[in-house]
Amino acid sequence: MAAKDVKFGNDARIKMLRGVNILADAVKVTLGPKGRNVVLDKSFGSPTITKDGVSVAREIELEDKFENMGAQMVKEVASKANDAAGDGTTTATVLAQSIITEGLKAVAAGMNPMDLKRGIDKAVIAAVEELKKLSVPCSDSKAIAQVGTISANSDSTVGELIAQAMEKVGKEGVITVEEGSGLQDELDVVEGMQFDRGYLSPYFINKPETGSIELESPFILLADKKISNIREMLPVLEAVAKAGKPLLIIAEDVEGEALATLVVNTMRGIVKVAAVKAPGFGDRRKAMLQDIATLTAGTVISEEIGLELEKTTLEDLGQAKRVVINKDTTIIIDGVGDEAAIQGRVAQIRQQIEDATSDYDKEKLQERVAKLAGGVAVIKVGAATEVEMKEKKARVEDALHATRAAVEEGVVAGGGVALIRAASAITAAGLKGDNEDQNVGIKVALRAMESPLRQIVVNAGEEASVIANNVKAGSGSYGYNAYSEEYGDMIAMGILDPTKVTRSALQYAASIAGLMITTECMITDLPRDDKGADMGAGGMGGMGGMGGMM
């Protein structure tokens, strides 16, 4: 086992604080409308330019192991805030730095660290309650656009695009961000259910100019099995031909004789058919077939539940207004499914999302909800260079997370004002701890709540104390707009922060800061001295004389 380096008390805390400050100072320059960029060097390719706090934090690794421990713990604050709300990483880092700095001063002055932590926790619980009172619902497109604009660093086109996307696919809909091919940002909305499976044979194509298949008011056969024998399909094909409508077959696979016969029938115009593979694999495929069945009012023909293809009638088939199939995708538009049944299915999947443990499962279930509930929107980010594209895409993703958080828990006045109002309300209510040390902890937390506003002002090149005092003297959503350098009603000016983002930033900052204040000892590996490690193998050189043994 490697030897350890151990530091105690003040020695440990000073080292840890130095690491915290290096990381936080690098992150906090990005805060606010006039925050600066940070350039990250990559071992390959061009450097990345970012204004995203968590991206800066993730790059920092310090040489001194004790300082690095401090930096890594604050990095955790940014990561947790990012995971919970998708934004507010810089605010969380600034809050953590302030609580740790003030808290360690109090510890050095002889306060009890455990009581300080309890005081900080009391103040944070009270602040979260105050934030909930200050929160207003974010329901209309204008508010959503404003939140997106602020989060995307005052880029109003991004805010507008996100608001349009949410309007089209609903607040629960799936919105993805992709790299576009032009200079302008674009919004692409796919209505109806789309899945990533294309036609099984190009001979089904009936729109040669677009290379796609379009079926108007088709019947939809859903089969959870491979279809290779055409005989089991005959009753259904005859019934569909009599009805004079096209047929879409979605099955595990259609192959051999069955596929060949379907192609011949289509080319001769006897019955208009198209076949695609069912989306997904294994259990997920079964679930997605069931989703399509709910959407189109059909039944999944599965031998597991005793249904056979030969006995399938028109009643078992789903229907939709229109289906469009190309090489890679199938879109079912306006399924005839019962609205109540679709909502029931959506509620069932939402329950699964709550129970899911892995992010991948949650994402896939969320996609299924969107496909059933409204559709999918794709924001294509445009930029002149690859470096700008990466930076912009990260900003748009942040803005999207922020708007989702705003829809979930509402919004508060931005620019650090909400935390100042929460702190003022706690002071006015006269929150007290069980002893004097806890009271100091409460003061530490309340002072830290001013730090985001102060940092925004510093980054804008103004005097922090003057502006902080002016904002404190006001009430409600009165604050300072660092972008236009004027005071006023932040909500009226469209400067909003999602309540969830502000709340998460404060809670995670206080959680990690509390642990660091109560640290008394730090242990790390001593650097190993590898210089003598290779010396032992040198004595084998004499073996060369063994050639004469033959």
Curated annotation (Swiss-Prot):
GO molecular-function term, one example from the UniProt record: isomerase activity
Cellular compartments per GO CC: cytoplasm
Keywords: ATP-binding, Chaperone, Cytoplasm, Isomerase, Nucleotide-binding
Gene3D superfamilies given in the database record: GroEL, GroEL-like equatorial domain, TCP-1-like chaperonin intermediate domain
Xref: InterPro entries: Chaperonin_Cpn60_CS, Cpn60/GroEL, Cpn60/GroEL/TCP-1, GroEL-like_apical_dom_sf, GROEL-like_equatorial_sf, TCP-1-like_intermed_sf
Reactions that this protein is recorded to catalyse: ATP + H2O + a folded polypeptide = ADP + phosphate + an unfolded polypeptide
The EC number(s) this enzyme carries: 5.6.1.7
CDD domains reported for this sequence: GroEL
EC class (word): isomerase
Residues reported to bind ATP: T30, L31, G32, P33, K51, D87, G88, T89, T90, T91, G415, D497
Record keyword Cell membrane present: no
Gene Ontology process terms (BP): protein refolding
Subcellular location, record wording: Cytoplasm
Function: Together with its co-chaperonin GroES, plays an essential role in assisting protein folding. The GroEL-GroES system forms a nano-cage that allows encapsulation of the non-native substrate proteins and provides a physical environment optimized to promote and accelerate protein folding.
Assigned protein family: Belongs to the chaperonin (HSP60) family.
Complex formation: Forms a cylinder of 14 subunits composed of two heptameric rings stacked back-to-back. Interacts with the co-chaperonin GroES.
Name under which the protein is recorded: Chaperonin GroEL
Encoding gene (name): groEL
